[in-house]
Design a protein with these regions (language model features):
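Alpha-helical transmembrane segments used as membrane anchors
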Residues: 1-214
Length: 214
């Protein structure tokens, strides 16, 4: 009898993996994680926005300062999000994707709102869209403002846009890069709306010229 009782208790007690799955599916846990993502995206927005005004003064401190110096109370960092916010902004904007890093904030906020069940969205579409815009604008700004990288504290296309642009120029030349940017932008608009194809057909058919002749 005692053995049967122990077996029943073992069956009724959920295993560790099932407990983890249950916690992950819990609506309250989703809400808390979503709220954290939204708050973190607001924090990054503050850090990014402040970087445009305080980045020049903070750059030397971030580049030359050690972890201990940045962790100090009197670190002299002027970014409104503190030394960690200044580091994140400098890394994501200058070292990564430039000002298109704002699309990271957009996706984090949307993902947070979905987890909180504030808005019903197709998260995978937002992920694809934000990723494409992140990469495209990084390359565009890196290519268009390549000559300003040496004279500015902020790299509009980030190091990603700068390095990819240099490689593309070496392969297809400046006109080729503009063509690649144009065709990829058109493909993105087609991905967003099928009406783009209709508009392009009218454009290539020169329908507006035919109307003027009539």
């Amino acid at each position: 009898m005692a053995k049967k009782k122990l077996d029943k208790e073992a069956e009724s007690t959920p295993s560790s993996p099932s407990k983890i799955v249950a916690v992950c599916k819990n609506e309250t846990v989703h809400f808390v994680i979503g709220l954290m993502l939204v708050i973190f995206s607001v924090y990054l927005l503050l850090a990014f926005s402040s970087f445009f005004f305080t980045g020049a003064a903070d750059q030397s401190i971030i580049d030359s300062g050690s972890s201990a110096d940045l962790a100090a109370v009197n670190n002299q960092v002027k970014n409104y999000a503190g030394s960690r916010g200044a580091q994140l902004a400098s890394y994501l904007i200058n070292d990564c994707f430039g000002i298109s890093s704002f699309f990271i904030l957009v996706f984090l906020a949307v993902a947070g709102l979905k987890l909180m069940r504030v808005r019903v969205v197709r998260l995978w579409k937002w992920f694809i869209g934000c990723t494409l815009l992140l990469v495209w604008f990084s390359i565009f700004f890196g290519f268009a403002f390549m000559d300003h990288y040496q004279d500015s504290f902020i790299y509009l296309g980030g190091m990603h846009g700068y390095n990819v642009s240099r490689w593309l120029i070496s392969q297809v030349g400046v006109p080729g890069v503009w063509m690649i940017l144009l065709i990829t932008a058109i493909c993105f608009f087609i991905y967003i709306s099928a009406r783009t194809v209709i508009w392009l057909r009218k454009l290539f058919a020169l329908s507006f010229l035919k109307r003027e002749k009539k």
